[in-house]
Amino acid sequence: MVVTVYLLIVYDVGVERVNRVKSYLRTELHWVQNSVFEGEVTESQFRRIETNLERIIDRERDSVIIYSFRSERAMNRNVLGLEKSPLDVIL
Amino acid sequence: MVVTVYLLIVYDVGVERVNRVKSYLRTELHWVQNSVFEGEVTESQFRRIETNLERIIDRERDSVIIYSFRSERAMNRNVLGLEKSPLDVIL
């Protein structure tokens, strides 16, 4: 059985790097909202995402937080206002 | 024993409402990064936060996602680059 984890990534990066971070993360995870991505990944995918993000960001100026959970069931999601990217449409 | 939940709030709101959302959430939770707040709250605090956010945002244009977890232990946090607001300094 492949072990997976559920990721929630938020980032606050320089405007000159935002597009690169966003287009890269779109290849790995689901865009949820401005600067927020989610998705289920394998351990090796998780490490690859970390390595690739480290290459894109400027460690002195940018901030990326990767929250990881044993599964999506660990979280409840309550949306106020617009649901910019309904996850159930994608999954 | 008071039941608490751990919240992670991300928001994507119109520029004319960002300051109001941010200054309100600063009264309830810890600012973690641009448009990201965290904190442990009681069930009644959780409902108050939802009610107050509903009053501030424009439901047609803005998006707020409230992730809730049974406790902070449900999540692992991995920061790449700058830790804009070291949570351990605040807690």
From Swiss-Prot, chains A, B:
SUPFAM superfamilies: TTP0101/SSO1404-like. Keywords: Antiviral defense, Endonuclease, Hydrolase, Magnesium, Metal-binding, Nuclease. Its EC number is 3.1.-.-. It holds the Pfam family CRISPR_Cas2. Coiled coil: none annotated. Signal peptide: none annotated. GO terms for molecular function: metal ion binding; RNA endonuclease activity. CDD domains: Cas2_I_II_III (cd09725). Its cofactor is Mg(2+). Mg(2+) binds at residue 12. One of its GO terms (biological process) is defense response to virus. It comes from the Archaea. Homodimer, forms a heterotetramer with a Cas1 homodimer. NCBIfam families: cas2 (TIGR01573). This is CRISPR-associated endoribonuclease Cas2. It comes from Methanothermobacter thermautotrophicus (strain ATCC 29096 / DSM 1053 / JCM 10044 / NBRC 100330 / Delta H) (Methanobacterium thermoautotrophicum).
